[in-house]
Amino acid sequence: GTEGGDGGPLRGDTLVRSYINRLRSVTTTPISNYKDDPIYLSNFGVMTELDGSLSIDTLKFSDYFKSNPSDFAALTKNRVTSGNALIQATGTGSLYKAGTYDLSLTSSDNRQSFTAATLDGAAMVLENGTFKGDSTNTLGINIVAASGAPDTRIFIGNSLISSLREFSKSVLTPGNAIDNKISTYSDE
């Protein structure tokens, strides 16, 4: 129904409430796996008002963006990064899973070159100087370690846009749960 009016047949429905709650949580749910600390939409000045609408404090956005420009990727772009500048981490395809994974490197010459690596506790495949992820979580992750590189963490982050896209897909795909609810009410 309209604001303040009688609700329709889906008013109070648990599925509809769960969709609304998921959308409302956008401003409070941390965006993880981009760096050691999570990134919040509120860091960029995005706030939920009492009526449920969103607003942006442009000064807070500008200040945070100036001091943390790479954090903006958490809103717009899926990203694979390393916790150390001596290690280049990239992702190909879409089989790898968002997460923060420990990378361990093996060297027999005081870390001048590397003969083996594990990521997410699984051995990586070494191919032409590139270590390739070979576990369920890291398939498609490529690591190139420069001389002197330490063990570190690899961050695989799913952006806010990507998360919203997945949510939209689950809600809008034909035959989804909400279609089934509507069809049930239409049949009655």
Model-inferred region functions:
Residues G1, P9-D187:
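Bacterial flagellar/type III secretion structural subunits and associated motility module proteins
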